[in-house]
Design a protein with these regions (language model features):
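Acidic/histidine-rich catalytic neighborhood of metal-dependent amide-processing enzymes
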Residues: 1-80, 113, 117
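Active-site-adjacent substrate-binding region
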Residues: 75-166
Length: 166
């Protein structure tokens, strides 16, 4: 795919994994990464979700547009999408990580989108689910973002991985 959705997130995950390995960071809990190529049609993470998974973060993108809070300079944290609301406690945890680590963020609602996290929930996974990512303009068109949004999303992903499970 030529789109930043979702090559940007995959690149940030690979960068995070390299950092964890190179810096020999000890994570407070087991983290599994699942990269899907079917998220856009709702098949993403609807199978093979271990019953040991407690929290499920979809690391995707924040769609920019008229009526949206998201922008291309911050990390976008989703409160609700077309599938319904995301787990409030987990959303609050993400917001608190941003505040504590001085990560610029926006909270948004995406009425026309869903994510791998909502697909896992619909498939019956008993999880706390959340969604965040870099703010990206013109999803699936001539996409663009700002490096500040990439850094904010990377920093929240890193902070989340080092935080305890709620």
């Amino acid at each position: 795919s030529r789109h930043l959705d979702d090559k940007a997130s995959v690149a940030m995950i690979l960068d995070l994994l390299e950092r964890i390995k190179n810096e020999q960071i000890k994570l407070p809990h087991t983290i599994q990464f699942y990269i899907s190529n079917n998220e856009e049609i709702g098949y993403g993470a609807n199978a093979s979700i271990s019953n040991k998974i407690v929290e499920f973060i979809a690391f995707d993108m924040g769609a920019l547009g008229e009526g949206q809070s998201s922008d291309e300079y911050t990390v976008s944290i989703c409160a609700k999408d077309a599938s319904g609301p995301y787990h409030k406690e987990l959303k609050t945890h993400l917001v608190n990580l941003c505040k504590f680590n001085h990560i610029p963020y926006k909270i948004d609602i995406y009425p026309y989108y869903t994510s791998d996290a909502s697909a896992a929930l619909k498939a019956g996974a008993d999880i706390k689910h959340g969604l965040f990512g870099a703010g990206i303009e013109s999803s699936h068109a001539l996409e663009r973002t700002h490096i500040d949004s990439i850094h904010a999303a990377q920093n929240l992903l890193y902070a989340y991985c080092l935080s305890s499970i709620n």
